[in-house]
Amino acid sequence: MGKEKANVKGCRFRVSLALPVGAVVNCADNTGAKNLYIISVKGYHGRLNRLPAAALGDIVMASVKKGKPELRRKVLNAVIIRQRKSWRRKDGTVIYFEDNAGVIVNSQGRDGRVSGIAGPVAKEAGRPSGPKISSHAPAIV
């Protein structure tokens, strides 16, 4: 009597976890933040004593380490849009980026507080976080 997960709707293909709590990622939007320090990962349920880690498309709680003074020392929501750790898509392609990056989003974690994103965005990151991130991206990979 094993647990069967056939025909489960709404589950996404698993992306390799790449960014543990304490990681510093680039901020790829034009809000004025330069670096984001990951404090926690929303919706993470893991093993005892294991550091929570984020992957593409995950919503994280982050603070701004470098950037405009009005953004610093505040806890903000962000979505991871690029990661250096490679992951495999269902079609067999293996993809990775040359940096780790995220964008600041609103308190619900849906739409970004941005009007521009620098660099490409993975298509896995655009789906869960709403249409705004995908529409402001110069390239979707």
Curated annotation (Swiss-Prot):
Highest taxon in the source lineage:
Eukaryota
Gene3D superfamilies given for it?
A: Ribosomal protein L14
**Record bears the keyword Translocase:** no
Q: Which PROSITE patterns does the annotation name?
A: RIBOSOMAL_L14
Report residue spans for region: Disordered.
118-141
Q: From which source organism is this entry?
A: Trypanosoma cruzi
UniProt protein name: Large ribosomal subunit protein uL14
* HAMAP family documented for this protein: Ribosomal_uL14
Give the GO terms filed under biological process for this record.
Answer: translation
